[in-house]
Amino acid sequence: MQPRIRLLQRRAVHFLVLIGWQAGVCRKEALMEYEGRICRGPMEAKAFMLPVTVGCPYNRCKFCDLFTDLKYRKISMEDIENELKRVSALGGNPSLIYLGDGNAFQLSTDELMEIIALVKRYFSNAHSFNSDATITSIKSKSDEELKTLHSLGYNKLYIGIENALPDVLNYMDKDHSVDEAYSEIKRLQDAGFSYAAHFMTGVAGSGRWEESAVAMAEFLTETKPENVVNFSMFLSADKLSEEIRNGNFKPATELENLKEERKLVELLDVEPAHPIKWDSFHDWIHVRTRGSLPKDKDKILSVLDKAIAKFDKLPDIYSMKMGTPENDDGYGFLGQESPSLKDVYIAPGAV
């Protein structure tokens, strides 16, 4: 039987927003103006998101088209202060601040210090600052700079690790190596920061789910992130789809992605004294696992086992957007009802 490919009419960025809507974390903020789409880790849902940059300064990863329509730039201190004034005048005084956009940590230490000072001037409750970061943005700061930022309340960075196989990172044009990820995260933690790891099942392509899981489990076990979020890879119609059409990349099926996650959770060696908050999305097939490791490990594995058993009986499914063919009704599968796993949707546990 020929594999059925889900054909998506939305941009991949919309997929990320759909993930966020399900988790209650990506939305238009009522009290702020924001270019593009808002996306952040689920655990930052209660934080006030303050835009300090627009887009991504790197913007070359093959798997990502989240920021391709945005030209990276810094938001002026004047505009940042005006936003703080506006929110403060409306009675806002948040304690948790999330600095946006795709890599706010790319700003210089002096710029970040100035922003933190501005926030504290208008929000007396503000005491904790988090943001997205890349390994290269961490590398750009000295040990002393990292310690200084942490002393001012900068506490956690969300880092796109994606995969722990060197050739995969190189092929996908990530701006760091596996060795750099190990060393820079250690420097970050030595300065007092915690970190959250973002990774993507399926990014290594078909047939590599097991070796990807083994490498990622080793990486996460050693680096001890506070949170782990899996945004199972969604194939866009831009850079990566061209590689697929040219035969240079064979995408993993959703079944392979589920097996990769299952193997990773199985292999993770998490100390009870240093638990990991786990959240994983296979949004296009409606599978999500969530919990605290190691406490909820068996529950999460049970959810994945049920999902694997169901999808093992179905034709191959790919989370893929390859244009807008006339015979696609917008729901994928060319008019056929798509399978879901609502009965095994979520593993109970702490978020």
Q: What would you call each of these model-derived segments?
A:
Residues 136, 160, 164-168, 188-212, ...:
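Conserved strand-turn element in the central/C-terminal portion of the radical SAM core barrel
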Residues 145, 206-220:
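Catalytic cores of alpha/beta
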Residues 115-126, 180-196, 254-269:
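Alpha-helix-loop-beta-strand connector modules within alpha/beta enzyme cores
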Residues 3, 10, 22:
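Cationic, low-complexity basic patches in intrinsically disordered or flexible, solvent-exposed regions
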Residues 35-82:
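Canonical Radical SAM [4Fe-4S] cluster-binding loop centered on the CxxxCxxC motif
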Residues 15-31:
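Short, Lys/Arg-enriched N-terminal segments with co-localized hydrophobic residues
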Residues 66-83, 87, 91-107, 122-140, ...:
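Core AdoMet radical
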Residues 27-42, 221-351:
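Auxiliary Fe-S-binding modules of radical SAM enzymes
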